[in-house]
Amino acid sequence: MKVIQLYIIIFYLFSLSCNSQENIVEQINPNLFGFNTSNTFTYCDVNDTSFTNKVQKIKPNVLRFPGGTISNFYHYDEKAYGLDISEISDWNVPKFTKRYNGLIKEQKKRNHNHNYIEDFILLAKKNNSKVVLVANIISSEDDDIINMIKRFKSENIEILGVELGSELSNRAYKKYINSVDDYIHLAQKYSNIIKKEYPEIKVGVVSAPIKYNMPSRLLNWNQKLSEETFYDAIIHHSYLKVIDGDDDYGLMTREDEVSSTKKAQFDLYKKRIKTYFNTGFVKEIIKYNEIFEKEIWITEWNLQMSKTTGNTLLQSLFVSQYLLELLSNPDLQNISIATYHNLAGRDISGSVFKGIKGGFEIHSTYYPLTFLSKIFENDIVRIEKEVKDEVFIYDCFDSTNNLKISFDINWEKNEFILSENMGTDSVYVTKYLSEDLFDMSDEEGKL
């Protein structure tokens, strides 16, 4: 029998102020609370207030458009994402052709005859979100990205930066990007196009994953890129692998058979996540800092996507702690933009919302993300972290040094707790919890 799914209690505490003598207070970076929008507008309707009201409960500060891989084939003046299947097939990547044939079929089925930039603008305006754009640098007209920038500026939507392609270090693109030199040629061309019209807009380049047994195509990718000066930031995609098996750019492609119980299996995943937050995350970023003297944009992050961990309590606790580490860890402050993968789509392991016939489902990450949005509602300027055994506590203070909210990620009791100071010595407490880390949420996001 499961414990209570989502409940609220009120209790009383005294003296919620902090006596710290901190003199300089840095504002928490709101650009770390962002979301990728790949496939969001194909499977979810921005004219459906039941959907947009849920998004507004999260209130994303940043949205990424068009998204991930799809950005490399996006065309501004065409229907939906403007996909041209003959153009995509030319790369000789069967999974691309299959995926985008299916997406085009779905768009036609739903009579989506407008470009999805219209839906994106509507969603961004509803949430007062800034935008990170991804330029198609492999198949678009030269002025496509300029027209996109002009459109967002005409709508008074702030552009944080432009990514020069998405994951173009991936071997899927080796037919025409066989080396970092090929990528630099394309990226510099589009950087020059953007900077000529809009010199104030930052551009980011695609870094290569740093891992053992680097393929020869990637061996000198980062080093050569670090010697260039035409860009402002590097782009890193961060997907933590906790499942044994094979993975490829954020997705588990094969999982080893598991003979242990599900509880033992997820306890192992928990151990790997805790190790990551204790040392691994910082080490991951330091490796890039040692090569590049640039800010870092993490424009996709999540657990490696898998039906095993997707939509579980484990995933929701991971997502909560990842964001809190981004916002509070001084060793991660070179990360200036972060967008979670993904806001909405048709998958179970990547998206907060899953589009279904006649509506959408809510996944386990939703309620914790609404908790975390409280950080920006309360004008938090500092987050202090404390660790007690398997409990990670994040205390959040305002500019007058008052403790406004606190988050407890309790890996022992399998719960995420939000405590809000309501004044007059009262605290409002909300919990998201379940008996087991492998418990999955129902279609309303409850465990």
Feature locations, PLM:
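N-terminal catalytic cores of secreted or lumenal carbohydrate-active enzymes
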Residues: E22-D232
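Aromatic/acidic polysaccharide-binding cleft in carbohydrate-active enzymes
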Residues: S71, W297-V391
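Structural beta-sheet core signal
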Residues: L133, L164, V205, I298, ...
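Carbohydrate-binding surface patches
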Residues: K388-S426, T430-D436
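C-terminal beta-strand-rich structural cap/linker in extracellular carbohydrate-active enzymes
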Residues: E443-L447
